[in-house]
Amino acid sequence: MTQRAYNFNAGPSALPQEVLEKAQQQLVDFRDSGMSIMEMSHRSAIFDEVHNEAIALLKKLYAIPENYEVLFLQGGASLQFTMVPMNFLSTDQKASYVLSGSWSEKAFKEAKFFGTPVEAASTKDNQYRNIPALADIQFDEDDAYVHITSNNTIYGTQWRDYPDTGNVPLVADMSSDILSKPIDIQKFGLIYAGAQKNLGPSGVTVVIIRKDLLEKANKSIPTMLKYTTHADSNSLYNTPPTFGIYMLGEVLKWVESNGGVTAVEKRNELKAKVIYDAIDNSNGFYKGHATPESRSLMNITFRVADEELEKQFLAEAKAAGFVGLNGHRSVGGCRASTYNAVPLEACEALRDFMVDFQQKHQ
């Protein structure tokens, strides 16, 4: 086999090699059925077992209480930008959005179709280099909800702690750091996440929603856009992304077999430190975008001091087997996405490349 790439893609992103190899082994004949999991009816007993195993394991790994539902939807986090306000924001209500990057801006924009979104806080004036201080977040007790984006892939920032919103439901887009660290689910009314960074391949959107919110959701909206439709049918109202759910379940098994979410967090801290140390010890040759207290463990964003040298850095890195180091097209620069499945060895190899490149060109 060709040597595996050092995959730092921002999403879809690296998957555990052992999960890929297991899927390869099971691809043609799944559980002695004579069929691939991709060929099976989503109403079959075998897929039903796969589906329910994945839900149960996510609940176990994240200690999700009984008063929450886990849904497997489609449309990505981008559809959740619409579904959240469509279900919970009426024309005479406000919802508070914390703006910490491009994705929170997109969510904010979608909410305008349904009610009145207001800025609870924003760090746009600081080029989204940091997460707003908890004390700066403003919202009213009668807000429909408060919305945050827990990790910002483009700018490389991440929430360490979450706001206490009291009786106002806290909604979080956790697409890029779900399952990267333990969290207290009960702080949140709703969590949503596209799978393609930490949970599996693209095509599945995970929603964790408190049951009392389901009871309050708008009933006068299209059937497929109601959370209750999917909660009442165990996410099987229509044909689900069967292979994606199977892969998600296998990734969850991998997390469990490698020590669970607490162990994942420790590995992520170590991986990120390896690269951040290379930036911090470079005497300004590499410059991080995010302020240190807001640095993401998932997306490490930086610039090379000289623009022409930065282009050379990215070209040589690509030639050396590093994939996905270009920053987002909207901001440029460099970005190393170190999601759960990215091995420490890849981060150490990137560190060594960065140090070597600096020594050659400083």
From Swiss-Prot:
It holds the Pfam family Aminotran_5. The keyword Transferase applies. Pyridoxal 5'-phosphate binds at A77, S78, W103, T153, D173, Q196, N238, T239. Gene3D superfamilies: Aspartate Aminotransferase, domain 1, Type I PLP-dependent aspartate aminotransferase-like (Major domain). Pathway: Amino-acid biosynthesis; L-serine biosynthesis; L-serine from 3-phospho-D-glycerate: step 2/3. Keywords: Amino-acid biosynthesis, Aminotransferase, Cytoplasm, Pyridoxal phosphate, Serine biosynthesis, Transferase. Its cofactor is pyridoxal 5'-phosphate. The modification N6-(pyridoxal phosphate)lysine is found at K197. One of its GO terms (biological process) is L-serine biosynthetic process. GO terms for molecular function: O-phospho-L-serine:2-oxoglutarate aminotransferase activity; pyridoxal phosphate binding. Its EC number is 2.6.1.52. GO terms for cellular component: cytoplasm. PROSITE patterns: AA_TRANSFER_CLASS_5. CDD domains: PSAT_like. L-glutamate binds at R43. It is an enzyme of class 2 (transferase). Catalyzes the reversible conversion of 3-phosphohydroxypyruvate to phosphoserine and of 3-hydroxy-2-oxo-4-phosphonooxybutanoate to phosphohydroxythreonine. This is Phosphoserine aminotransferase. It comes from Lysinibacillus sphaericus (strain C3-41).
